[in-house]
Amino acid sequence: MHETHSPPPPSEKVYRLMETRREAHTAIDEVLGQARREIRIFDASPKLLKDREFGHAACIDLIRNLLLANRDHRLRIALHDTRGIESDLPRLIALLTQFSGQIQIHRTIGQATEARDPMVIADNAHFWRKLHVDHPRSVVTLHCAADTRPFVERFEEIWEQSELAVTGSNLGL
């Protein structure tokens, strides 16, 4: 009998190590696709978010649909440097203008500026994380709150040491 491999059922834990940018982009899309309430993103700059395809129409549509589903749904982004966000991520900025009460974009300060592990977290149960900003390897875990918890805590530590940097009303200043 010929054995076929199919994707695991949606509730089964998924863990993968990625070596390439293309694999990482696919994994990020998977994490974003799992979001039902909140997305947390930490990265160094708008340019790196753009390189990870956060400016693409499909990604923005996914985030828009999440935010439209409920006013309590959130997108929180922490960046080391927010310069260039308008030119690098115009669709994200348009989304921020439309959903200013649901999206926050912060800039890291203090010890948080030393963080070097970009991550995307959805709903406390799914995450993509780059092991170090300068290295190609990254990991994705889906459907596992226990494995995601340390990265939620890590994000919250970074968030606590950040300040509001971009709002729908201070663009273009």
Regions found by a protein language model. Give the residues of each.
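Domain-start "cap" segments at the beginnings of catalytic or binding domains
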Residues: 1-35
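Terminal leader/tail segments of proteins
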Residues: 25, 62, 66, 74-75, ...
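Primarily the HKD phosphodiesterase
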Residues: 31, 35-98
